[in-house]
Amino acid sequence: MDDKTQTGNIDVRLLELLVCPLTKGPLEYDAEHGELISRKAKLAYPVRGGIPIMLPSEARSLTE
């Protein structure tokens, strides 16, 4: 894949389809931490081996 279709380890097309399982809101990819961020739920879902782990029990709580 080229740079236009991939962001770090996440395919941009996949990122456009994924939503937070709790809020159904959009996600942002944080390449530095390898996480998908749900601002609305204040959770960070891990990405392991290029695979998003979309389980709330696996998510890290974001603190402000």
Curated annotation (Swiss-Prot):
One Pfam family of this chain: Trm112p
InterPro entries (alphabetical): Trm112-like
One GO cellular component term noted in the UniProt record for this chain: cytosol
Protein family according to the UniProt entry: Belongs to the UPF0434 family.
Protein name (database record): UPF0434 protein Oant_3286
The organism of origin for this protein: Brucella anthropi (strain ATCC 49188 / DSM 6882 / CCUG 24695 / JCM 21032 / LMG 3331 / NBRC 15819 / NCTC 12168 / Alc 37) (Ochrobactrum anthropi)
